[in-house]
């Protein structure tokens, strides 16, 4: 089996043990983090280049396999404790590939609450059930059943005896792992998700699902989540439907061994009861749970993609930005920040009020633009955003220098403004003005600003509140950490919120880093990190490669080269004939050509490192302090507004993707209405 990263089934236990991918408690004891650099580098050396998302998926697969093995052994022990474990059962457990298959095997041995079958067994009817199941040609079930009539046991007549026997047979059919597997497969292939209105006269957003059917194997995630929500809110009744003929025939092939026997009809009736009363309701729950779980996983991946796109937007560096937090009644909050994000000025204007107020607001905006030499206006995309955009576009036409504007997502700005972190960062500002500061700063550096907000508060998808919140939180946190680690952080300027997303650092250590910085001045090397209280060797190993120190005398401290690779990096530069002066200045011109001339394989062998590590070192030395966000399309700055009436057939426009969903994307082209594109590869 291949689990996606070239790991064979035989390798899994060793890999899981070596990398602590599965045993989280052990990882915690070792001070390990999911994105630990040592972990990543070892996997990369074994399997080639892997991004953090692939590593995370690999980790999740291994965790599932470990939980599968754990449950397998638990069931084996439980059955053995009942002295019913056979070689056949043990082999079936070994061959089971899913938790559902394991539970099917365990079902007959699971302690049961009182059931119709258990009551019949208490009455002594199990021998009758065994006789009927044998289906011997000469067997007369009625005659045999007469022997079990006993009023003291509440078996008043033959019908009672046969019914009890059928209850026992039905439960046995339901407990048959092979039968359940067949029915499950049939339901997955032929089943249909059906939704009907609880009250067809009552209008709701779910009207399209009031009489709706779609095959289990085809239903899209967003439609499944929609009917689930409609059911939860009381508008829909949802079920799985399937024609009964094929499943009943499938059961009969297993249970009816002698169709000509009089007992066969009784077995057939018991099979029908087992399917209708016991098997299908259980399979229906399983299918809906599996579909929902799968839809949630896929949706969370889409949410993660949306969040990643928000976080990895290219920064607008070194520009003075005026942030506008739009509003109607309470006005539009204004904040001006310099190129470093420092607050220069604040105000409140009323661009959606009376004509006099609009004129006054325009004058105030132009005054702020002139006073602080504003380069760009950042407009939040919430309530009154369109009106504010029109106002700003009109106002900047009268500015004394070129000014551009951009609409940014204001999701989570209000959450940030009311947070303890905002109160600590901006104690002098009113809560409402803090959101304007956030809107300005998230244009300058979206990642640095958005990490201050809980990922779920950023708003990354339509059904995010229907997701398992713990799992969603873990997924989004992983995305944030991946983005921060990908970009890196300046050790001397990064906020505690940004530092806390660096692999290996917790909130206590982050606060200690800031405290050390304030007490001792700027860090002069990565090695100085080791002096920070509570930052141990494991944490240093994991975080050092993601932290930059521009002020260091060692040029490698300002690159994405990990300290454990410094020796290899220096040896590489020596092999490539760079002078001490060039190394000190960090100027490695013609590096790629020199590496090619020597041969990457030869260099890797000489340095005794893997090719992926060598490639990473070369990339980092070639592009000092490279920011992966700079390789993406620059933010779309506008100086004038476009109206939908201005659009003509065959026009080609650039736009900003505002939201990605599993059936398309919504794109802002600046005309007040998002375009929709479903043709996304």
Give the role of each language-model region.
Residues 70, 74-78, 429-433, 437-522, ...:
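Long, highly charged, low-complexity intrinsically disordered interaction regions
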Residues 54-57, 64, 68-323, 327-429, ...:
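Duplex nucleic acid-engaging cores and interfaces of nucleic-acid transaction enzymes
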Residues 36, 40:
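Short alpha-helical Gxxx[C/S/T] motif in the catalytic ATP-binding
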Residues 2:
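Acidic ATP/Mg2+-coordinating residue in the GHKL
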Residues 7-19:
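Short conserved segment of the HATPase_c
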Residues 20-30:
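Glycine-rich ATP-lid/hinge loop adjacent to the conserved G-boxes
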Residues 148, 158, 252-255, 267-271, ...:
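Low-complexity, acidic/Ser/Thr- and charged residue-rich accessory regions of DNA metabolism proteins
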């Amino acid at each position: 089996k291949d689990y996606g990263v070239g790991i064979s089934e035989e390798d899994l236990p060793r890999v899981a043990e070596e990398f602590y991918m599965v045993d989280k408690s052990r990882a915690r004891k070792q001070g390990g983090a999911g994105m630990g650099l040592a972990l990543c580098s070892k996997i990369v050396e074994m399997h080639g280049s892997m991004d953090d998302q692939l590593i995370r998926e690999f980790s999740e697969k291994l965790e599932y396999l470990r939980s599968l093995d754990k449950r397998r052994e638990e069931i084996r022990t439980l059955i053995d404790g009942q002295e019913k474990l056979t070689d056949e059962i043990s082999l079936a457990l070994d061959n089971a590939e899913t938790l559902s298959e394991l539970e099917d095997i365990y079902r007959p041995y699971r302690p049961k609450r009182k059931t119709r079958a258990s009551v019949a067994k208490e009455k002594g009817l199990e021998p009758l059930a065994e006789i009927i199941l044998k289906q011997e040609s000469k067997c007369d079930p009625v005659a045999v059943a007469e022997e079990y009539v006993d009023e003291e046991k509440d078996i008043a007549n033959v019908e009672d005896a046969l019914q009890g026997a059928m209850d026992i047979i039905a439960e046995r059919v339901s407990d048959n792992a092979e039968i359940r597997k067949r029915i499950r497969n049939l339901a997955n292939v032929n089943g249909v998700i059906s939704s009907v209105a609880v009250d067809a006269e009552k209008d709701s957003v779910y009207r399209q699902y009031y009489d709706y059917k779609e095959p289990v194997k085809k239903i899209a995630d967003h439609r499944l989540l929609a009917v689930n929500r409609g059911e939860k809110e009381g508008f829909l009744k949802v079920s799985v439907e399937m024609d009964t003929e094929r499943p009943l025939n499938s059961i009969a092939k297993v249970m009816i061994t002698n169709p000509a026997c009089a007992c066969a009809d009784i077995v057939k009736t018991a099979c029908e009861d087992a399917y209708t009363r016991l098997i299908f309701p259980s399979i229906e729950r399983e299918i809906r749970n599996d579909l929902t779980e799968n839809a949630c996983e896929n949706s969370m991946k889409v949410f993660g993609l949306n969040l990643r796109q928000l976080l990895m937007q290219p920064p607008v560096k070194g520009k003075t930005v005026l942030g506008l937090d739009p509003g109607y009644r309470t006005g539009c909050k204004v904040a001006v920040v310099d190129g470093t994000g420092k607050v220069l000025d604040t105000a409140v204007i009323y661009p959606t009020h009376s004509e006099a107020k609009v004129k006054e607001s325009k004058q105030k905006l132009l005054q702020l633009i002139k006073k602080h030499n504003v380069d760009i206006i950042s407009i939040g995309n919430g309530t009154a955003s369109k009106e504010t955009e029109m106002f700003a576009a009109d106002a900047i036409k009268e500015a004394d220098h070129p000014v551009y504007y951009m609409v940014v997502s204001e999701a989570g700005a209000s959450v940030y403004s009311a947070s303890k972190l905002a109160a600590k960062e901006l104690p002098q500002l009113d809560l409402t003005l803090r959101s304007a500061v956030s809107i300005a700063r998230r244009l300058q550096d979206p990642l640095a600003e958005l990490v201050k907000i809980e990922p779920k508060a950023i708003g990354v998808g339509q059904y995010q509140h229907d997701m398992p919140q713990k799992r969603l939180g873990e997924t989004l946190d992983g995305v944030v950490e991946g983005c921060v680690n990908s970009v890196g952080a300046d050790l001397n300027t990064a906020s505690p919120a940004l530092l806390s997303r660096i692999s290996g650092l917790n909130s206590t250590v982050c606060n200690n880093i800031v405290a050390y910085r304030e007490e001792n001045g700027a860090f002069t090397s990565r090695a100085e990190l080791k002096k920070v209280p509570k930052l141990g060797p494991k944490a240093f190993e994991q975080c050092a490669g993601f932290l930059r120190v521009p002020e260091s005398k060692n040029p490698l401290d300002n690159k994405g080269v990990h300290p454990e690779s410094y020796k290899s990096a220096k040896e590489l530069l020596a092999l490539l004939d760079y002078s001490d002066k060039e190394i000190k200045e960090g100027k490695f011109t013609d590096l790629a050509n020199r590496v090619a001339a020597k041969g990457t394989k030869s260099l890797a062998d000489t340095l005794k490192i893997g090719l992926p590590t060598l490639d990473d070192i070369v990339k980092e030395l070639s592009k000092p302090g490279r920011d992966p966000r700079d390789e993406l399309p620059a933010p779309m700055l506008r100086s004038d507004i476009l109206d939908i009436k201005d659009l003509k057939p065959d026009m080609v426009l650039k736009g900003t993707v505002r939201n990605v969903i599993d059936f398309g994307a919504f794109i802002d082209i600046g005309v007040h209405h998002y375009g929709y594109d479903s043709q996304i590869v």
